[in-house]
Amino acid sequence: MAVPKRRTSKTRKNKRRTHIKLAVPGMTECPNCGEYKLSHRVCKNCGLYNGEEVVSK
């Protein structure tokens, strides 16, 4: 059975794992208040979605 000849270093291990990561969510600016919000979702700050008040604050 094959075994590693040398121990894999931390640097080599981390370089191999550079592509294993989470994607950053798409953030957009709210046209009403200017706060950043997730796309296609209600703004947490002002409660508007697509120009209509969905959540009253």
From Swiss-Prot:
One of the record's GO molecular function terms: structural constituent of ribosome
InterPro entries: Ribosomal_bL32, Ribosomal_bL32_bact, Ribosomal_zn-bd
SUPFAM superfamilies per UniProt: Zn-binding ribosomal proteins (SSF57829)
Alphabetically ordered keywords of this record: Ribonucleoprotein, Ribosomal protein
GO annotation terms (biological process): translation
One GO cellular component term: large ribosomal subunit
Entry annotated with the keyword Nucleotide-binding: no
Family per similarity comment: Belongs to the bacterial ribosomal protein bL32 family.
Designated name of the protein: Large ribosomal subunit protein bL32
Taxonomic source organism: Staphylococcus carnosus (strain TM300)
